A protein has these predicted regions:
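Structured C-terminal helix/loop/strand segments within mature extracytoplasmic catalytic/sensor domains
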Residues: 36-79, 84-163
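Mid-domain, small-residue-enriched loop/turn segments at the edges of structured enzyme/sensor domains
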Residues: 1-47
Length: 163
């Protein structure tokens, strides 16, 4: 990651190790800035062969998990190369529901987006809907210039998302 100039990402433990202990999952981390830098490196083919870039983008575009996240509220046919992340649940708190991706707009421009929801009390459907709404709002802003209304979301209980 340092070689391709991607800051703010640390990978220490395997998925198997993470599954054994709740606290271990927090040793692997990526800030939104780091995730975006990684996607920029992928998009710009930094230190990556054309074949590897093509394969990674194909796998990310055809990914089935997370269809209700970044892709969820976008127009049918919108190309989204993305990678989800989902953490464990303990005492009703989900440690992470994330999606990062490269969204291709109808005019060929790209939006690189990272949405992280962490330590949430909200159910999975709500968390995924929030990610989808954020992606839709960003795409609406970039394609129409209009700021979408997001006033329906409230913050009353820490970790709980309500509409």
């Amino acid at each position: 990651l340092k070689e391709i100039q991607v800051p703010d990402i640390q990978v220490v433990n395997s998925e198997k190790e993470i599954g054994r202990d709740w606290e271990t999952q927090y040793r692997n981390w990526a800030t939104p800035k780091g995730a975006l830098a990684l996607l920029v490196a992928l998009q710009s083919q930094r230190k990556l062969s054309r074949e590897s870039q093509t394969l990674l983008l194909k796998l990310m575009t055809e990914s089935i998990p997370g269809a209700k996240r970044l892709k969820g509220e976008l127009p049918a046919g919108t190309v989204v190369a993305h990678k989800t992340g989902t953490g464990g649940i303990r005492n009703g708190i989900t440690s992470a529901t994330n999606d990062i991706g490269i969204i291709t707009l109808p005019d060929g421009r790209h939006i690189i987006l990272a949405v992280y929801i962490n330590d949430s009390l909200s159910d999975g459907s709500t968390r995924e809907h929030v990610i989808a709404d954020i992606a839709k709002a960003v795409c609406t802003r970039w394609t129409t210039g209009q700021l979408p209304d997001v006033s329906e979301y409230q913050s009353g209980v820490p970790g709980k998302i309500t509409k």
